[in-house]
Every structure is written in C-alpha cells, then in structure tokens.
Amino acid sequence: MSLFDHSVSELHKKLNNKEISVTDLVEESYKRIADVEDNVKAFLTLDEENARAKAKELDAKIGAEDNGLLFGMPIGVKDNIVTNGLRTTCASKILANFDPIYDATVVQKLKAADTITIGKLNMDEFAMGSSNENSGFYATKNPWNLDYVPGGSSGGSAAAVAAGEVLFSLGSDTGGSIRQPAAYCGVVGLKPTYGRVSRYGLVAFASSLDQIGPITRTVEDNAYLLQAISGLDRMDATSANVEVGNYLAGLTGDVKGLRIAVPKEYLGEGVGEEARESVLAALKVLEGMGATWEEVSLPHSKYALATYYLLSSSEASANLSRFDGVRYGVRSDNVNNLMDLYKNTRSEGFGDEVKRRIMLGTFALSSGYYDAYYKKAQQVRTLIKNDFENVFANYDVIIGPTTPTPAFKVGEKVDDPMTMYANDILTIPVNLAGVPAISVPCGFGANNMPLGLQIIGKHFDEATIYRVAHAFEQATDYHTKKASL
C-alpha cells in the first residue's frame, strides 16, 4: 500500500506520531516516479536535491505544535506557475531555458505551509489544448490506459496524482483545464471562483479566464489545498477581497434539502450516453440523501465555445506578444535584423496550436473586425453569466457531466482542432461566468476509462460544492478506484 493511498489528515497524524517521516513521503514520490514516469511522462522537471534537503530540514520539526495539515506533503506544480530557481517552461520550446527569479503567490503560500515541491508538471503548451498532445516536449499519457490522453491542459497535474507520483498538484483552468483532465484521470479537480486564488506568477494565457486550482485524490484533500492557496493578494489586481471560509466545516455528508439544477443543454446533443447515464445515476444517489433536482435551461451555453475561443485567443495574442527573443526565453540564431529576431524566434519557439490561437486572436482584434467578433463575444459572455445568475436565484448548485465522453485515444483528435475543442463544451461556460466548479469521479465508460461529475456553484461558494461533492464521494466508492499502472 502506497503512503499516498492515505489522506492528508491521515498522513499528518502519522507524521505527528512519528510513524513516518517527511523523507519517507518524498522518497515515496521519487520511487514511484522512477517506476512509472517513463510511461506516464507527467513531469518536465524534477527538483530532487532541494526536495530531499527540505525533507531533512522538516524532519527535525516533526511533532511541533504549529505544524499545519500540509506540513511535509509532496506536491507537483503545473509548469506555467513560476517557481524561483526551478525551470518553468509552459511546455514551450520558447521558454525551454527559463529560470524564474520569484515564486508565484500560490507557491509562496504552499512553501509557508511547509509543502515540498517534487517538480514541475507537463501540460499543453501555454495551457492551450485538451489532451496534453500540444506539449512542446512530449505528451503525457493517461495512467488508466497509456493508449489514452490524460486531458488538458493540466494533463501532467492530473496524471501525476492518478499515478500516485505525488499526493496532490496545482493546475490552471482557463476553459476546463483542471476539471477535464481530472475527469479523464479519475481524480478530483476544482476551478475556484475567478479572483478566489491569486494569479500572480501564473504565466498568462487569457487573463480574464485563468484560475489556479487544486487536483487531488479526494474532496477533503482538495478543500485543504484550496484553503491554503486562497485569499486576497496585493500583487494581483483581480484577486478578490472576499472572506475565505472554512471549507472543511461543511464536509458533513448532509445534503438534505439541497436544490440541484440540471441544465438540459448539458445532457442533450453532443453528450455521450455514458456521461449522461453516469450523471443521472449520481442524481439518484443525491436524491436518496434528501436533495431534490429539476431540469433547467442555460440557453446561451450553445454559444459558449465560439465565445470562448474568440475571447481567449484575443487575450492570448496580447499576452504572448512578450515572447519575442529580447527579454527572456530562447532566441533564434537565424537573425539578420530586428524583424528577423521577432519573426524567427516566435516561428521556431511556438507550436502549431499556439500559433493558431495567436492568429485567431489577432484577427478578432484587428481593425474592422473588433466590433463584429471581440465586442460581440463580450456581450454574449454577459448573457452566459446572466443565465447562471438566473438559475442560482432558485437553486444551490448546478450538476452535469464534466466531459461529453471518457478520455479518447492518443492521436485520435490531434489533427482535428474543432473536434478537439468540443471536448470542453461543458466546462467553458463556467469560466466565462467566473463561477466555481469541481469534477469528482462518478463512473466508468465501456472502455473502462473514468467519467467525471461536474458540480457548479455560486460565486465564492466553493463551500457548497465541496459539501455536495464530498457527500456524493462518501456515498460511492469511485474515489477508491486506482489506475493499475
């Protein structure tokens, strides 16, 4: 039995009782990485020397009264979250040699909680992708079946947790990039409310949509991690000054009287039968615990995909303009003048998907098209947000599938961008509205690949979605299933 089969609270107790050491936890992580990483390919960079030194330092503090629950816990960090002195590439060749000189706020907070960073996790380049096949280095595989994708863009973050390489990880979610891979890999992933977690130190893809969040084996562990990284940050102007409650207090298993909305659009055309049936089965479980549900409509969700790709690509075209070979990152050697420097550095450094989205965004923002595309997309975004607010006036949570289908095979969709984009049709509306949502395991498809249940909450009401997710988790055994890698 792996130490990582235990929860954070169980491991904390073992540490305090001196049944295990922090070094044991770190070595457990690196041993598992040595055993499976050649197949899974979840990591881009390991930090073994520093992690082992930190573990030794923390071992001397075991049993101290001020040790928090995350003390000594091994974590993986998505490679678009900057880490001081530890290579951060965004899985792009253009940043292949980039060593940041500061820590992201979330990394600072986790260091203050005495977690130990095991390494940096693979992803789709600059978080643009749904399968991890867009990594500029190599594709991560799904631990449940190496022939399948782990999802994206936080594919490495989800795969590392599912494979037992780390206890938990950080990902980022712009249009589903935490929840979708969490669903595909059979783990728990939360996208917090926009502004709940500081984005300072997150390399920007689409600044009005990006959010950092936790990926874990259980809902309880997820709540511990969100508790540690949430809160106002003066370094991030979009960070919200909203009180962070006690997420653990609501994990009682009680959902009696809870009002659940189920959008008909989330169970209709484009959603596979396996995903639909798994959600209906989950609703029966929650009904049996005293919750009620009704079908509702989110009428503008059908426009979410087009809206998202116009807005996110527009923001990306601006955000990625800084990668020009002048200030940091890789610089082309094939240069005769300044224009060559810009053009060749970006042509050689960016992958196809990143180039595709930069071009789309530049077009949407260009003179003569701004009103027709970008401005109209912003107006539709407001309508989508209003849809959610109208539903939440009468219901506590919204529930549906996280993805239309289980994970697909490696190479199956990589040459068809539109089919690939459709994997995010159920997660994107949440980002456009800025509300929080969690994915928890809720079954398996015919290919024995995991399915995820998406629970969506009101702005800054992560506590309620944790309560529902935890109640469902404890009433079922899906969270106990493990990839047999």
Curated annotation (Swiss-Prot):
Keyword annotations from UniProtKB, A to Z: ATP-binding, Ligase, Nucleotide-binding, Protein biosynthesis
First-level EC class: ligase
A molecular function GO annotation: glutaminyl-tRNA synthase (glutamine-hydrolyzing) activity
Active-site residue numbers: 78 (charge relay system), 153 (charge relay system), 177 (acyl-ester intermediate)
Domain of life: Bacteria
UniProt keyword annotation of Ligase present: yes
SUPFAM superfamilies for the chain: Amidase signature (AS) enzymes (SSF75304)
Chemical reaction(s) catalysed: L-glutamyl-tRNA(Gln) + L-glutamine + ATP + H2O = L-glutaminyl-tRNA(Gln) + L-glutamate + ADP + phosphate + H(+)
Coiled coil segments of this chain: none
Matches recorded under Pfam families: Amidase (PF01425)
Gene Ontology biological process: translation
Subunit structure, interactors included: Heterotrimer of A, B and C subunits.
Family membership noted in the UniProt record: Belongs to the amidase family. GatA subfamily.
Official protein name in the record: Glutamyl-tRNA(Gln) amidotransferase subunit A
The organism of origin for this protein: Bacillus cereus (strain AH820)
